Amino acid sequence: MPRVKRGTHRRASRKKVLARASGYFLTKSKLYRAAMEAVDRGLKFAYVGRKRKKRDYRRLWIVRINASCRAAGLSYSKFVHGLKAAGLDLNRKVLADVALHDDAAFRNLAELAKSALAVKESARLALEKE
């Protein structure tokens, strides 16, 4: 079995790790072992952060929609339920953008949701009377 010398491959992989660690504090950017630990840790945080970003944006959108709903005299949950009852399928990102930039359009959506809820409630009451 031939002897394996890892000179160029080892140097390349170490350079790659140290390049990723550039800008880290003290030995974390200079010594391979410390850089390796710091890079691994950083990559774990980056992975988690990509998942958290989705959660954080959804929470932000819900807060913005809720604020506009309250201004229109409706709670967030009733607004979303009313939109579903009206057959409108807008996602939270679009609703938050409309709430932030076009108040008149959002008020129209809120009125549409209110009317759909009223129709649904009257249908429920009619069924109860029978």
Swiss-Prot record:
The keyword Ribosomal protein applies. The keyword Ribosomal protein applies. InterPro entries: Ribosomal_bL20, RIBOSOMAL_L20_CS, Ribosomal_protein_bL20_C. Belongs to the bacterial ribosomal protein bL20 family. NCBIfam families: rplT_bact. HAMAP family: Ribosomal_bL20. This is Large ribosomal subunit protein bL20. It comes from Solibacter usitatus (strain Ellin6076). The lineage of its organism: Bacteria, Pseudomonadati, Acidobacteriota, Terriglobia, Bryobacterales. The gene is rplT.
